[in-house]
Amino acid sequence: VVKVNLTGELKPGCNTKEIILEMLRRVTIKGGLGNVYEYVGPGVAKLEVPARATISNMGAELGATTSIFPADEQVHKFLKAQGREEAYVELLPDEDAQYDDCIEINLSELEPMISCPHQPDNVMTLKDVEKRKVQQVFIGSCTNASYADIAKAATVFKGHHVNENVSCTCAVASKQTYRELMRDGYVDILLQAGVRMLEIACGPCCAIGQTPATNGVAVRTSNRNFKGRAGNPTA
């Protein structure tokens, strides 16, 4: 069991994905084989449940057996909002817990990052690739389709329009999330910006539609960017 101690707080412009990309940068896609990663520390308390789900989901990229977060006040708040408060049981690490290894991550030091072809651990800062032209953008998937994720994207799009040479699609996590985003006007902002909304289901991340063009460049918020997973090994 490996302790991942999170301290500090994410800067504006950084998202939860930065945390797991930093893990991939350090550990690599095979470095986590046989390991269980337990995320603890003051930085964890600031991460809401969907954010923790993103990190846990992408523990698979590390080769991890599983990833664990505490069932703390954030989980309590989430279950209460879902009308399931009675299901909450606090589950925290023992104060004297012993670990096989420890990884320290100061969230305040993280920069916006991106995983480049063709392995999830080929991590670079956004500054390294920001001038590259792209043909396709996909927003959503299991790892970035929560209310907060899509609302942030809509905020960026507000008052702008997708470039005529770019195909941009978005898939929301669930019907509940979709209705909340519609209620608050975020879906309308995306539609006005020229973003095409996809059905709530598996899709572009596992090559069910939206396959990139030959030798094309796609930017996706989805996980598992292994070669060919999007449907075209040349992209």
Q: What are the functions of these language-model segments?
A:
Residues 1-235:
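Fe-S-dependent hydro-lyases/dehydratases of central metabolism
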